[in-house]
């Protein structure tokens, strides 16, 4: 999860988020090299008195500044498309969970079970226990098994919402009348926090998301206790 004064990403806890972090570093290095080159050329133009006022054309230079940007764009586009297809791919999910956005809370339904659903509201600041996080704790956490492919179906009952958990690299829009889907898989147990990431009204800031990823045997015990 995030911590005060954090400047970077949250720790990756899913294969997709790890790929996104690698892509970010890859793209950032390319941007840094381009920026350095541009600054170097500008500094030369400002400090040197040498000019080429008689030059009418320079086909070699024009060829270079046409081909080089094309190569750079390819180096950015290929890994980006690879991750995009990875995020859209859904292979035999072990569990399906449907989440609906409301003003201003989330409801969850485990569709593989006959009667396992609940609403998840933010715990008010006045009711927090010592050690709990302000504006991030909920009365009902979403308990899921770790190291298993889970399909999330996301929609909304009223206005636009967005179901987002940064540590897992998830952000899926909740649109009324439309059912979007995404997959998640955590490589380690823990609590993962998120929030609604689409402005949806006066209490938009009070729609936290808490996922509790646990080993399979703990999930089975929890699901049995909820039925």
Curated annotation (Swiss-Prot):
Its main location: mitochondrion. Its EC number is 7.1.1.9. It comes from the Eukaryota. The chain crosses the membrane at residues 15-45, 60-87. Cu cation A2 binds at residues 196, 198, 200, 204. Component of the cytochrome c oxidase, the last enzyme in the mitochondrial electron transport chain which drives oxidative phosphorylation. The respiratory chain contains 3 multisubunit complexes succinate dehydrogenase (complex II, CII), ubiquinol-cytochrome c oxidoreductase (cytochrome b-c1 complex, complex III, CIII) and cytochrome c oxidase (complex IV, CIV), that cooperate to transfer electrons derived from NADH and succinate to molecular oxygen, creating an electrochemical gradient over the inner membrane that drives transmembrane transport and the ATP synthase. It is a multi-pass membrane protein. Binds a dinuclear copper A center per subunit. Keywords: Copper, Electron transport, Magnesium, Membrane, Metal-binding, Mitochondrion, Mitochondrion inner membrane, Phosphoprotein, Respiratory chain, Translocase, Transmembrane, Transmembrane helix, Transport. SUPFAM superfamilies: Cupredoxins (SSF49503), Cytochrome c oxidase subunit II-like, transmembrane region (SSF81464). This is Cytochrome c oxidase subunit 2. Component of the cytochrome c oxidase (complex IV, CIV), a multisubunit enzyme composed of 14 subunits. The complex is composed of a catalytic core of 3 subunits MT-CO1, MT-CO2 and MT-CO3, encoded in the mitochondrial DNA, and 11 supernumerary subunits COX4I, COX5A, COX5B, COX6A, COX6B, COX6C, COX7A, COX7B, COX7C, COX8 and NDUFA4, which are encoded in the nuclear genome. GO terms for cellular component: mitochondrial inner membrane; respiratory chain complex IV. The modification Phosphotyrosine is found at residue 218. One of its GO terms (biological process) is ATP synthesis coupled electron transport. Mg(2+) binds at residue 198. It is an enzyme of class 7 (translocase). It catalyses: 4 Fe(II)-[cytochrome c] + O2 + 8 H(+)(in) = 4 Fe(III)-[cytochrome c] + 2 H2O + 4 H(+)(out). Its cofactor is Cu cation. CDD domains: CcO_II_C. Cu cation A1 binds at residues 161, 196, 200, 207. Residues 1-14, 88-227 are mitochondrial intermembrane.
């Amino acid at each position: 999860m995030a911590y005060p004064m954090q400047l970077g990403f949250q720790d990756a806890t899913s294969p997709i988020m790890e790929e996104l972090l690698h892509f970010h570093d890859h793209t950032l290095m390319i941007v840094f090299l381009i920026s350095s080159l541009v600054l170097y050329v500008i500094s030369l133009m400002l400090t040197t008195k040498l000019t080429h006022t008689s030059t009418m054309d320079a086909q070699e230079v024009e060829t270079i500044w046409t081909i080089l940007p094309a190569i750079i764009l390819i180096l950015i586009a290929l890994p980006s498309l690879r991750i995009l297809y990875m995020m859209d791919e859904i292979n035999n999910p072990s569990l399906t969970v449907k989440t609906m956005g409301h003003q201003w809370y989330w409801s969850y339904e485990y569709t593989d079970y006959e009667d396992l659903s609940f609403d998840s509201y933010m715990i008010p600041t006045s009711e927090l226990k010592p050690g709990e996080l302000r504006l991030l704790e909920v009365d009902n956490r979403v308990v899921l098994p770790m190291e298993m492919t889970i399909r999330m179906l996301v929609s909304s009952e009223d206005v636009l919402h967005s179901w987002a958990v940064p540590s897992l690299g998830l952000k899926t829009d909740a649109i009324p009348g439309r059912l979007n889907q995404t997959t998640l898989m955590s490589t380690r147990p823990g609590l993962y926090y998120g929030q609604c990431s689409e402005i949806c009204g006066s209490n938009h800031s009070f729609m936290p998301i808490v996922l509790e990823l646990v080993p399979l045997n703990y999930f089975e015990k929890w699901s049995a206790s909820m039925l």
